Design a protein with these regions (language model features):
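N-terminal redox-cofactor-binding region of secreted/periplasmic oxidoreductases
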Residues: 1-257, 263
Length: 265
């Protein structure tokens, strides 16, 4: 998002990121993928509550604590949301969120080596590649699935999303191709983007019900930063609501947690 915003030369952008650099080989080397998602240095370390349907087990919920976020610690498998989900959103009232509306944006981000150009992007910053298919087990797996009554597809990010077939991966020239590599690092070269690493956001600062700034800790020091245009809370599906709740935005029912709720959502 910061990359797109800095394309407009009128604006400068600041990013507050609690994590650090992604230079380590455990992040950039695809075969080391299991390490960063299990390291406190790169992972927030969230876990679920005991799951009743799983005999009380507690599951790990890795979330990236490094530039690039979870795209720097995930398994690098690239899967779009299902087209029918986007269409359902639009049918439910989210105008402009149907799959025909979002498809151009998927294509704009992609630089995919496979797939039909009517469905896949070929010139975007996010490289998407296929692995080698010379192992006979690859074809055997797909054939076994077909014999069991499942569908097969050559491109699950194309026209037919359902089925067994080759995987798309965010890997380029043998390295992980994260959001940091695809978007952040090129944007940092423009001098329109300032990145604050090791910056732990505490809350959004409001004035007259309008977000004006951010309160954060930076290397142990309390700091505040103010925006002249907009503030975007893009901390992921767990940390974004957490920040908003600490800022007084959320359900009134959370007041028993000593969270001030000034703006009910």
């Amino acid at each position: 998002m910061a990359h797109r915003l800095t394309e407009d030369k009128k604006y400068s952008v600041a990013i507050l990121e609690f994590g650090g650099n992604d230079y380590g080989p455990l992040i950039q080397m695809p075969s080391a993928l299991s390490y960063p998602m299990n390291m406190n240095l790169y992972n927030w370390g969230y876990h679920t509550e005991p799951e009743e349907g799983l005999n009380g087990r507690i599951l790990a919920c890795p979330r990236g604590k490094v530039i690039g976020g979870s795209s720097s610690i995930n398994g690098m498998i690239y899967v779009r949301g299902n087209a029918s989900d986007f269409d359902y959103w639009e049918e439910s009232g989210a105008s402009g969120w149907g799959f025909p509306d979002v498809l151009p944006y998927f294509k704009r981000q992609e630089n995919s080596e496979a797939g039909d150009e009517s469905w896949r992007g070929k010139n975007g910053p996010l490289y998407i590649t296929r692995g080698k298919r010379d192992n006979p087990l690859n074809e055997a797996l797909v054939n076994s699935a077909k014999e069991a009554g499942f569908l097969a597809t050559e491109d699950y990010n194309g026209f037919q999303q359902e089925g067994f077939g080759p995987a798309d991966r965010t890997i380029w020239k043998g390295s992980r191709w994260s959001a940091a590599n695809a978007y952040l690092k090129p944007a940092l070269k423009t001098k329109k983007l300032k990145l604050f690493k090791k910056a732990l956001v505490k809350k959004v600062i409001f004035s007259n019900n309008e977000a004006k700034g951010i309160s954060f800790n930076h290397y142990g020091l309390h700091k505040e930063i103010y925006a002249s245009k907009e503030i975007i809370c893009s901390a992921g599906s767990i940390n974004s609501p957490l920040i908003l709740q600490r800022s007084g935005v959320g359900p009134v029912s959370y007041t028993h947690l000593t969270l001030p709720t000034n703006r009910e959502v």
